[in-house]
Amino acid sequence: MKANIACVQMAPKVCDVKHNLQKMSSYVHEVMESNPSTNLILFPELITSGYECGNTFTQIAEIAGEGPSFKTMSNLAAKYHVNIIYGFPEKEEKQSNIIYNSCIYITENGNLGGVYRKVHLFDTERKHFKKGSDFPIFETSFGKLGVMICWDTAFPEVARIHALNGADLLVVATNWENPYSDDWDLVTKARAFENCIPLVAANRVGTDEKLSFFGHSKIIGPTGKVIKALDEEKEGVISYTVDLDDAKPLRKNYYTFFEDRMPDLYKRLLSP
């Protein structure tokens, strides 16, 4: 199965949801008007809010499937018949004081397809967000998606769990900051290679209060080779048609990671 993927590299305005949604909408229009056959549009982590919102996160967080960002993006998804994934601060439905750093998946029909809550929180995120507790697979018309958010990508266990659960594509939404671009380039290629699964990653650009972000959004093949990337620290979009079936013969010839695994010897990995 082939999937035409668009990866948006954008600079959000910190704590300004209305502005960011207008900008996101413009990118959706741009992508779909230039390539109506696009299957998936991916935005970065916390793209509706920006990264350094501090206590304001509690004011602008949304319940998944409700709120301004979902209404705006679901209408666009249905209009263009395209799947959309983006990062946002999520408010737990019954506990308004509990906030997650989440990615929402909206189906090509404009429905809520699922939510992933970031498990590996980084640095100051722990002051504002509660960590997630599972790694769901999102079912689409073109294949299964395993989503990671930023620091999750530094942990090989996450991508491996997605692979074992049948993911056809690894999807990463991030706010990876300067000066750690080399680390970002390394871990994204490694996660694709060690699981022999293509990976698409959207990082933001611009500056919030203190941090600046370098972009380097990319699409990586199942052997870890970068197929297409935005290397400059500026806004833009990359699009590419990924053949999700390419990995299958590779896993039988040389990239035999799953055939050669020895889970019985890995019990130490489950210990603290």
Curated annotation (Swiss-Prot):
Lineage of the source organism?
Eukaryota, Fungi, Dikarya, Ascomycota, Taphrinomycotina
- Which domain of life does the UniProt lineage start with? Eukaryota
Spell out the Gene3D superfamilies in the cross-references.
Carbon-nitrogen hydrolase
Instruction: List, from the UniProt record, the residues annotated as the active site of this protein.
Output: E45, K118, C150
Q: What class of enzyme is it?
A: hydrolase
Tell me a GO biological process for this protein.
Answer: cellular detoxification
Q: State what protein this is by name.
A: Probable nitrilase C965.09
Sequence ranges assigned to domain CN hydrolase in this UniProt record: 3-244
State the PANTHER family in the record. Answer: NITRILASE C965.09-RELATED
A GO molecular function assigned to this protein is: omega-amidase activity
Q: Which SUPFAM superfamilies match?
A: Carbon-nitrogen hydrolase
Report the source organism.
Schizosaccharomyces pombe (strain 972 / ATCC 24843)
Where does this protein have coiled-coil stretches? Answer: none
Predominant location category: cytoplasm
- What EC identifiers does the entry list? 3.5.-.-
**Pfam families to which the protein is assigned, alphabetical:** CN_hydrolase
Q: Where in the cell is it found?
A: Cytoplasm; Nucleus
| Keyword annotations | Cytoplasm, Hydrolase, Nucleus
Cellular component (GO) terms are: cytosol; nucleus
Task: Report the sequence similarity comment from the record.
Answer: Belongs to the carbon-nitrogen hydrolase superfamily.
Q: Where are the transmembrane segments?
A: none
